[in-house]
Amino acid sequence: MVRAIVGANWGDEGKGKITDMLAKESDIIIRFQGGSNAGHTIINNYGKFALHLLPSGVFYNHTTSIIGNGVALNIPFLAKEVDDIVSKGVPKPNILVSDRAQILMPYHILFDQYEEERLGKKSFGSTKSGIAPFYSDKYAKIGFQVSELFDEEALKEKVLSICEMKNVLMEHLYHKPAIDPEELFQTLLEYREMVKPYICDVSKYLHDAIKEGKHILLEGQLGSLKDPDHGIYPMVTSSSTLAAYGAIGAGIPPYEIKNITTVVKAYSSAVGAGAFVSEIFGDEADELRRRGGDGGEYGATTGRPRRMGWFDAVASRYGCRIQGATEVALTVLDVLGYLKELSICVGYEIDGKVTKDFPTTAELKKAKPVYTTLPGWNCEIRGIKKYEDLPENCRKYIEFIEKELETPITMVSNGPGRDEIIYR
């Protein structure tokens, strides 16, 4: 059985915790898109971790963790991440990397940095991890697959050709030193040795695993609103963040995905530029940011303070719809216990008309939030294990959101720890 875990919002919804929890009953966990540009924060008996490339199931001995063909594979980053968790007492995980995964090159990171500098105030707020240049090359058919590392003659020829092309941009657009093709070739040979133990025909491996009845988790990165087709374009990421892409980025038939667990945050947060209708500011935002997450709302990759907002039912319902959500996991509910009342954005006012449908970016920029207010529960809910033991106003908040999302909320996270979860 294949289950996807994806985000309904801007990312940072708490997918890592939900994956870590569900991995206990799973055999295989797969990252199918994105790269090291976003982090999944996990707190368990080994400590606190922010994983960027490794799937969130690496903390269990019985699981196999897979980097799928849809991932932007930063090989030295992967090696470092494995070393980091092992140094903290985590048993070395069983990792496989698709032989069809493409390599995030050193120059992808440079181009990402230089382009943000060139754009200045018009920049996209990139994490500068090389993601957009990587996917640009992948779809321009000038990327490097892992399998290409093993034909040195062809690899060297390709490096020379690519460097000639890239150096035009490097020298004439960005006015930076040219890429040395010999140095790059040697770097790729080093990458080969780092990744060699993990390489596998992942689609064949998964085909056999499905036939054997294995439990498989597809772990998504970021959320619906960052999808390049269905998100707030152009303030999006460069790979699809939807569960539907899990079939492509892992190499399985789409009909095998039986369950789509969509993770939704009990309030809103975002990193980077772009429209954010329910955003709040000043002391109100600072207080929510300070209390939020598992030690404050700051980007797991960049450390940047996240933009904060009230729960946006319009955006979240849309996010669940385009993910094809079969169930919702509602996270960070415990953070809101200090508030006497809670605002929920239930509609957008655009040019004097109210809509409950999520619009395209041009219209979204004009949207003003339409709020409804619910009473808070004004107490701590961590440690509660049963839904019926939650304060009445807390349950009303959950049930109001569930009705707005039009999708059942089956899990409620009431703390950052692995076991701080309430099932409904």
Where are these regions (language model features)?
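Non-transmembrane, aqueous-exposed alpha-helical and coiled segments at domain scale
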Residues: 1-424
